[in-house]
Amino acid sequence: MRPPRRKGAGRSGALGDILHEPSVRQKVTAMPQTDQNRAREPRQRSHASAFAPDLAVKVEAAASPLSSPSGTPRQVAAEPRTAKHLQAGKPDEPRRATAGAGPGRAEASPPQLDAEAFAANLTRLAEETARASKAYLKPQLAGESSPWVNAEVGEIARTLGEVAERWMAEPQRALEAQTRLTSGLIGLWADALRRFEGEEVPPARPPDPADRRFKDPAWKQNPFYDFLRQSYVHTAQWAEDMVREAKDMDPHTRHKAQFYVRQLAAALSPSNFVALNPELIRQTIEQNGANLVRGAQMLAEDVEAGGGELKIRQTDTRTFEVGVNLATTPGKVVLRNDLIELIQYAPTTEMVLRRPLLIVPPWINKFYILDLNPEKSFIRWAVAQGLTVFVISWVNPDTRHADKGFDAYMREGIFAALHAIEEATGERKVSAVGYCVGGTLLSTTLAYMAAKGDRRIESATLLATQVDFKHAGDLQVFVDEKQVRAVEDEMRSHGFLDGKRMALAFNMLRPNDLIWRYMVDVYLKGKAPMAFDLLFWNSDSTRMPAVNHSFYLRNCYLENNLTKGRMVIDGVTLDLGRVTVPVYNLAAKEDHIAPALSTFEGSRHFGGEVRYVMAGSGHIAGVINPPTHQKYQYWTGGPVGDSFQGWVERAEEHKGSWWPDWFAWIERQASERVAARIPGGSKFMELEDAPGSYVKVKS
């Protein structure tokens, strides 16, 4: 009979705040020592044992021991199975034999490796690794591989090479820096030797409770692994210091170097290697390597699914389906053109605000981040407040859309939606919401409309939106003239930028949570990830049309033309100062994509009243924060002043969600209510039910 699975698996991470469950902590057990061992222990532990600590003594067991004193059951991985079989529990699970609790009962022996089973699993591991290698090499051999990876590696080498050059120009400072590194490591090793002797030594670098990589108690309780952890932290901090202290570096190069050092530090963590991670060693022994076989199976499947590139498995994608258990707010598609489907949502109140609401989501992701499920849906909540909600669903572009630029997204996106809303409701004036790059497009459109005297948008809400890119955060590391040209060259061959590129860029902003966590849990522990709607959305990437994306990179990130009055759309030079409609500008305190400072600076370029609000958490969780969850907080501080720091100091904190504050602001703009409207009205054919077809197209 198969024993039950262990509990304690951490919840999947997200693009916003990552929630972790605490590791299971159990008492450390050790093998009994003989008198002979005890007699010679002190001298040996200061030499050989210190370098090769006995796992049975010094590695804490995270779960019940694998075997009883009578022996260890053999485990050999089954024939190749799909991820579906893996998650269903069909592969062999380790049998956990534990000692009874009665008097005179011996304590369970530590995990023992079954050599025959381990050898069989190593054979299977080699087969699955070869399968993954074959999938990786297939596009390389066919001449279809993207040059992006090699270009990025070259950029990393060039950037870090500049740091090295600065230090080589100052040999004395370089020697002092090297001395700091080596003396720190020697001190840590001396502390480890004292701990091996049984002395209590406080760690020079205490564990960070928020760092889940080192949650296993062995990282703290075992002197060898504690030395390994502290040495890693010490070296990583030293590398960051080297970048920060390098002289005569321009800010952009230093920023890139800091970013790349963080990537390398995340990749080289000892927790990422089977031979250095006590939890992985323990699980591999307990399962005779079957965990590695399962992980290699999933690795091969994910490289195949990525067309030769690893598409990291962050969640169980089979659990979700757009339109079934995601994006389920009732509504109708009332307009479709080459770029958008416009969705009008069905009312749930008898009376609604006269002024309709148009939501312009980002096209870098899909709109259903605003409609994940009934409990998290901003769209459903807005409908429940009595708003007639229209949402643009952008096409997932292909080669046919290569020449669609920012101007096309304005005309065929926002302007087409405004015309359809007027036809469907009879209302010419609307309130508009823009999220992320959707907010940048909305701001651009407002400046264009101001130049043309068009006042159809009476108020604007910007969610985590940048219009001033001077402080644009870590995404700036991917944008300089050389890198933009490389992206343009890549897009030229297909007419679009593959969604995998943007997905990887976003994952690199949080490498420990969104890359290496899954490399370890999925591909080394062999655990199929949990179902998590937010991570499903995160992996449901979209492509970007070549002309549009080039315009965005150059005019926003590279040249910051919108706030400098140099952006031109359809021959019109744009000036945000001419935008006088009320603006509700929401930032997120921990946003790593549109930093709060960046969005604050953008507020000062508009010509009308701006209500700047800062939500707790990050780019996603700060925005998608329903009032019923009673999570986080938001700050209001009145008009935008001279400095962001000054605004923060005088801001007033409010518990919970910003959504009610926003709706009160919307209602103050135009509070008149009318009878609820049926989607499409009398002038539109209902093309299909929400969420439509465009959102279901995969990259």
Which residues fall in each region the model found?
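Amphipathic, low-complexity, repeat-rich surface-exposed segments
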Residues: 2-7, 13-341, 352-353, 390, ...
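Alpha/beta-hydrolase-fold enzymes
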Residues: 248-283, 423, 427, 445-549, ...
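Short beta-strand element of the alpha/beta-hydrolase
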Residues: 353-362
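Short amphipathic alpha-helix adjacent to the substrate-entry channel of hydrolases
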Residues: 371-388
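Alpha/beta-hydrolase active-site loop
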Residues: 403-424
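Alpha/beta-hydrolase fold nucleophile elbow
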Residues: 425-437
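Short beta-strand/loop motif that positions the catalytic acidic residue
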Residues: 585-587
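Short alpha-helix in the alpha/beta-hydrolase fold that links the catalytic acid
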Residues: 595-605
